[in-house]
Amino acid sequence: MTAISINRVAEPYIKNKASRHLEKNRVVIFASGTGNPFFSTDTAAVLRASEMKSDIILKGTKVDGIYNKDPIVHDDAKKISEISYADYLNQDIKVMDATAISLAKDRGLPIIIFSIMNSSNII
């Protein structure tokens, strides 16, 4: 489902329709962010997860977790196995944007960061 009209690719996002798909045990993929400027796809993911009352956010990205600094740029980056929302924001970590983390915090949504570069992480 998409936030902007791309009828040849996917149906438009309508919350109640997405809920009905899930009730029928269908897989629903949300694409194209929120359709609004200034909101990242990370924020859109947390927003949609909140709307759908999801239990968790799974973020596939280039790195295999949260680091104290970008491991692609810094060889001495240290992996952080677990971090609170507040510490994530205070340490200015960038794997997800602050708006997404703040919204996840407000909703109590846990987030798992995993690498999409590792084929064993993709089902």
Task: Indicate where each model-derived feature is located.
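Short, acidic/hydrophobic/Gly-rich beta-strand patch recurrent on exposed beta strands
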Residues: 30
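Active-site phosphate/oxyanion-binding loops
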Residues: 5-27, 37-123
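A short acidic/basic microdomain associated with nuclease active sites
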Residues: 1-2
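Short glycine-/small-residue-rich Rossmann-like dinucleotide-binding loops
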Residues: 33-34
